[in-house]
């Protein structure tokens, strides 16, 4: 291979490595968890929203919640069998201990969790003192927007 060809290949490789990576964007609206007559008043007015980015296999979320009747106590990344089907916790969130506030978290997803994200089976749940099994929850949906990182 000639010297100019090698230089061209090296320059092209350096340019590709220096290019910004695209991160996939996700959103979710947090709605009250399923309720019955015993906990309806504790969750019915609660709302929230979030944005998330996926860089490689690392999912990062940031969001807010409001209208809780008691302070939030925690939150989690969760995986269900499909969108709308509740499932198990796969990671923890940092949640403000308040009736309205913010939350955030980062999790490294494995292959099965990445597949679940693509089929919208990953969701976020925020718990509170009066609703320890979930005050609000929302399934992650592709925002249709990629972000430069």
Regions found by a protein language model. Name each.
Residues 2, 20-75, 79-149:
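Metal-centered catalytic cores of metalloenzymes
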Residues 13, 18-20:
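N-terminal signal peptide c-region/cleavage motif recognized by signal peptidases
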Residues 1-10:
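Bacterial N-terminal signal peptides that target proteins for export
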């Amino acid at each position: 291979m000639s010297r100019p060809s090698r230089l061209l290949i090296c320059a092209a490789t350096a340019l590709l490595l220096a290019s910004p990576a695209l991160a996939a964007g996700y959103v979710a609206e947090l709605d009250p968890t399923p309720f019955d007559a015993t906990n309806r008043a504790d969750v019915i007015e609660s709302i929230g929203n979030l944005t998330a980015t996926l860089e490689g296999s690392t999912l990062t979320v940031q969001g807010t919640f409001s209208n809780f009747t008691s302070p939030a106590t925690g939150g989690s990344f969760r995986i269900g069998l499909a969108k709308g089907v509740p499932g198990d916790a796969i990671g923890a969130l940092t949640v403000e201990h308040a009736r309205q506030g913010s939350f955030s978290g980062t999790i490294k997803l494995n292959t099965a969790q990445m597949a679940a994200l693509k089929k919208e089976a990953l969701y976020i749940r925020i718990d509170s003192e009066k609703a320890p099994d979930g005050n609000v929850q929302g399934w992650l949906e592709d925002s249709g927007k990629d972000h430069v990182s």
